[in-house]
């Protein structure tokens, strides 16, 4: 370990911070107890992204018990759902000759094309079985505009249309978000980075997420998040 990294980790522990520039929590630092200014964001833990779903994330079901344990530590919990229309612009089936995981150009830029998934009102779009969040206060549904995708819980892919989550959190004095759910390299990462752009402290709880990892997208997502100041932690870094 370099002298610079040792000093960064030492400073983070001494200041009671979880990490700096994407480094994990120092082993000597005590777990942090979230206060009333913190919120747990549970992103898209839905049947469509779980084993047997239409767009399954490998081991996606394994985040559920971790998130359930974390929930006990938070006064503020927000849940998101992908909520697509039939024939959504992000579906490969909408574009003649296109296959899932190819790309196309839409009005707001390059769009990854997905299998049809999380269609409004279907069981595929339901929250995953076993997810227990009885104190969750808000559900954000995203991706329901037919011509625009929405990975982030804050802002749709056009980078203009807001979901209202920013105002909801700030009106309640919340300044820190802990992001969990599916998938690390898409909806989780975009949510965490938008949180930073909007002035929140943002943590991604790594073992409470799983990735799709298309052609190195997971590694890129972690680098992009670190560059934005998103902090990467484990569930054990949070006191129950």
Model-derived regions: residue spans:
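Short catalytic/ligand-binding loop motif for oxyanion handling, primarily in non-cytosolic enzymes
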Residues: 85-89, 148-149, 187-188
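Histidine-anchored nucleotide/phosphate-binding helix
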Residues: 189-197
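Short, well-ordered alpha-helical scaffold segments within catalytic/effector domains
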Residues: 64, 162-166, 189
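N-terminal secretory signal peptides
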Residues: 1-4
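Active-site acidic carboxylates
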Residues: 16, 30-143, 171, 175, ...
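Histidine/lysine/aspartate-rich catalytic loop segments that bind and position anionic ligands
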Residues: 134-163, 167-168
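N-terminal export signals
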Residues: 7-27
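Glycine-rich anion-binding loop/nest that anchors nucleotide
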Residues: 174-190, 204-210
